[in-house]
Amino acid sequence: MFNRSDFDQLTVEEKSYCRAIGDCRGLHFVTYPSVAFQYPDSEETIRITRAPKQQGENGLKFWLHAECVDWHHERESYFVGYVSDAKFEAISEAVFNKMVAEQAHYLIAPLKQPLHEPSGFIGALLMYSMKTEFIVSLFAEYEDEYIHFYWDTTS
């Protein structure tokens, strides 16, 4: 699993939106727009991105790609700063699952939880939380896949 040190070793080019948007085999995601929530005026969005683990990778490439899935091209110049400000705080599987549950609480159709069966957990990182932004960004690594959970609100 990657950490802040792995990220810091990347060049600015390797952290760029153009590089991050590149190929990430098996990546798939589901997005819950504001109308999926009980209170659509809250303008919340959830995006859950997954990909099978690739041999020889530590998840960093997946995380960068997952962060730019819904990134707007006109904001490309802000991407490096955004990913560079991530906290890379190690969290437990219980904390990961609790944070997902808290952000998904107001979905009209309940989110199947936990996002991964409770086996094969390797580690998780809190990248952004409500402590600093109106964003929650989490990364989890399991023996068979990577998961990125993203929640934000514009209100």
Predicted regions and their residues:
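N-terminal "domain-start" segment
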Residues: M1-M99
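Acidic, proline/glycine-rich low-complexity IDRs
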Residues: H105-S155
